[in-house]
């Protein structure tokens, strides 16, 4: 019975997620399935920008994309299998979220079963322990608990099932293994880009896992991977998938210099996040990004010292752990295309769990202070802290989705009204309000135009009957990660740039380093035809524009994350 404990752990840790509902991208994807949004199709639910200015124009002119969105923005990810699973859930289970979370739980248990099978083959002495660490890994919390992120679990499940078949083919001569692994690799890539990261283990195994062998033999072993990846790259380009124009997602093929510039900090941030079990500070608290990078710089020599002290003496076992570690490092590299976060490390966790289990087992047998140093560090980072995340994330998601629903309901949107978000320091009501209104079955506005989503105070000055100037104080627009998702620094704006919206035109009046600090909006209709709102730190609140010549000051309000962590406070 003990041999199956890892599967029980995988099942139990995902249970809290079953109590949460739908959140963020779930709202958008469910809206597409129900035919409420026409920017993409049911089998392309991860298309958030097609790279086509004409196709994106209505979503900028009417909203909810902010006015500064790059017209050619491309955020188009090729995940047809994962899209199909979401369509299945939506059409079979409807508005009931819990069965869809149970569906995710089953995938997570299957993933843990595949990992356990690999560990029994590769690290039999610590297989069950490694699989428990794997099941607890906080890198899996969001992929297993957020429906829109399930694609990562599905992708690595198939790829690592293919790795099992690959090992049987290469080490035991199972001839069907080549075909089975090829099919599994293809299914994994059809589920999501995380499958590419998971393939790093196959490459690492062929590179150093089999010891000395002719290059021709290594090439033979890599043939299934090469075939699938080549077909995948062709499909990716033919379907015009990829990312361009966003600072959040950088395509290493189309934007190699931007990728290389961002890669070092992102690499060490990811290493530190995994080594010390850090929560997603990079995303939630941008001011802590330097600390996250520093944690990775500290973790690197600590990891090397732990290896020197506690690595197994057996040469074959050291070689196995070495190729698993190399595979884990290789799995991190594709994640550098986007911002550092624990959920990107799903593919890296296979090798890390085996490595940590082996080192912890050796540390436990050590003597003196070294033993407790290793046990406290590795045990705390890879056991205790992840357990807290499995409980905390569902609570946070449930709280955020409830508060977001309360915030948009409080606005009492009228069917067909023209809503203008003057300022929202919180990105959820700024850009997710319309999908959330669809999910809630509330009346929909005709337009939802976002003028500022900078985390700054704003002055709104009425300069004429139908003219408004908006100036951010103490900073710049498009300078936070959520804003840069819509326009990267490589696409600067200049004073005089004009952006047409529906019944309004935005003109950039002043910039700082290509990022606006002041803009003018000319309204085509009387002010009474628009509904002006702002995020006050609690709800979306309606406002009345000041008289001509007067200024309205909107303070910097708390975000939902800040309110959740620090408690409520008045706007600055």
Give, region by region, the residue ranges found by the protein language model:
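Polytopic membrane enzymes that build or remodel cell-surface glycoconjugates and lipids
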Residues: 1-429, 433-438, 443, 504
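C-terminal luminal/periplasmic domains and tails of membrane-associated envelope-modifying transferases
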Residues: 409-419, 424-572
